[in-house]
């Protein structure tokens, strides 16, 4: 019987592991990956974080290099691996969770390897886990090449011809800009993109966010509610410039697929050769057989990561407590809080 089991060995899970280690608990982290940092290594080749190194570290260990520079995805993958080794955080890799049940005062976790029992369970699968691909993708002809942004690595994966990137977030923007350098590129967004500079003066915009309290704004504060209502901006002006230069053609929200064509909100249509779905991720909780975890809309019920189900915790959710919760720098504060609550507050 473990004191705590953490499901997910990304930055959220190992941040919890850091504080569990300090509290002398008997714990283990389970992850289906073959190595720590695998999810970062598998993302598209050109990915660079828009948070500088000084805002891309976990508790207890700084990311090496120019603190004002932007780290690559491989740099983050290597950092996470080194972090686990330095703090000797116990992780069982190649372990996929099949089901989770609550039995009286403990959780029973069934995996592809064995069964585990634990008093506390932390769900750290994070926001970037299971691709969310709209059902209209099934209405598109088979010969049209489709990928989720998490599967995209480089342009050589695509078929000849144009590409439609669906999704107005930062990943969609970066991928569209990259592809626009070699082929006709369309970007479909629900809303008109809002752009923020990556740098103000010689400082990262996240330095200014930090000093102005934006990163620390809780989801219930006036500032936090305002930011959530506005949605996430596109960081940097590369997309804006590409649209102005007509290298990227902006389209409205996709509402339907019809064989070779995609239909948009303004009733226009477009014949496409490739589609990249930069449509985010969903929480993979279909195997959790516990009542009271989700509300009627399928959202996780929690307060700062503490579930109404005794002994159950969540970490790595967007706006779990504040604006910085889903960022590398911010997840440590949430991890410290839930371990503190686990130990009696």
Swiss-Prot record:
UniProt GO BP: cobalt ion transport; potassium ion transport; zinc ion transport
Spans through the membrane: none
Keywords: Cadmium, Cell membrane, Cobalt, Cobalt transport, Ion transport, Membrane, Oxidoreductase, Potassium, Potassium transport, Transport, Zinc, Zinc transport
Localization of this protein: Cell membrane
The EC number(s) this enzyme carries: 1.-.-.-
Cellular component terms per the entry's GO annotation: plasma membrane
Primary localization: membrane
Membrane topology: Peripheral membrane protein
Highest taxon of source: Bacteria
GO MF: flavin adenine dinucleotide binding; monooxygenase activity
Gene3D superfamilies found in the cross-reference section: FAD/NAD(P)-binding domain
InterPro entries registered for this protein in UniProt: Auxin_biosynth/cation_transpt, FAD/NAD-bd_sf
Function of the molecule: Involved in potassium and divalent cation transport. Enhances the transport activity of the cation/potassium transporter CzcD.
PANTHER family with a match to the protein in the record: FLAVIN-BINDING MONOOXYGENASE-LIKE PROTEIN (AFU_ORTHOLOGUE AFUA_4G09220), FLAVIN-CONTAINING MONOOXYGENASE
Protein name: Uncharacterized oxidoreductase CzcO
Species lineage: Bacteria, Bacillati, Bacillota, Bacilli, Bacillales
């Amino acid at each position: 019987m473990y004191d705590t089991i953490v499901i997910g060995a990304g930055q959220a899970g190992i941040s919890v592991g850091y504080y569990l280690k300090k509290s002398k608990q008997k714990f283990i982290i389970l992850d289906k990956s073959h190595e720590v940092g695998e999810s970062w290594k598998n993302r598209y080749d050109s990915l660079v974080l828009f948070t500088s190194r000084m805002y891309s570290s976990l508790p207890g260990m700084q990311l090496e290099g120019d603190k004002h520079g932007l780290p690559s995805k491989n740099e983050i993958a290597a950092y996470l691996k080194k972090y686990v080794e330095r703090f000797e955080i116990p992780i069982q890799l190649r372990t996929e969770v099949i089901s989770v049940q609550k039995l009286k005062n403990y959780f029973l976790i069934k995996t592809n390897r064995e069964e585990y029992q634990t008093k506390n369970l932390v769900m750290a699968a994070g926001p970037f886990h299971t691709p969310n691909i709209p059902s209209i993708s099934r209405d598109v002809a088979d010969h049209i090449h489709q990928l989720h942004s998490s599967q995209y690595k480089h342009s050589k994966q695509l078929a000849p011809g144009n590409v439609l990137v669906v999704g107005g977030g930062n990943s969609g923007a970066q991928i569209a800009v990259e592809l626009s350098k070699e082929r006709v590129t369309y970007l479909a967004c629900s809303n008109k993109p809002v752009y923020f500079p990556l740098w103000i003066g010689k400082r990262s915009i996240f330095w200014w966010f930090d000093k102005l309290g934006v990163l620390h704004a809780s989801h219930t504060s006036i500032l936090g509610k305002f930011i959530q209502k506005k949605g996430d901006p596109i960081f940097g002006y590369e997309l804006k410039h590409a649209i102005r230069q007509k290298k990227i053609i902006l389209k409205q929200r996709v509402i339907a697929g019809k064989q070779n064509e995609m239909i948009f909100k303004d009733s226009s249509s477009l014949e496409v050769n490739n589609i990249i779905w930069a449509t985010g991720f969903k929480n993979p909780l279909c195997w959790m057989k516990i009542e009271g975890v989700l509300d009627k809309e399928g959202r996780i019920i929690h307060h700062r990561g503490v579930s109404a189900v005794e002994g159950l915790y969540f970490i790595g959710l967007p706006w779990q407590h504040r604006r910085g919760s889903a960022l590398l720098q911010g997840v440590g504060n949430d991890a410290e809080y839930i371990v503190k609550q686990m130990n009696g507050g």
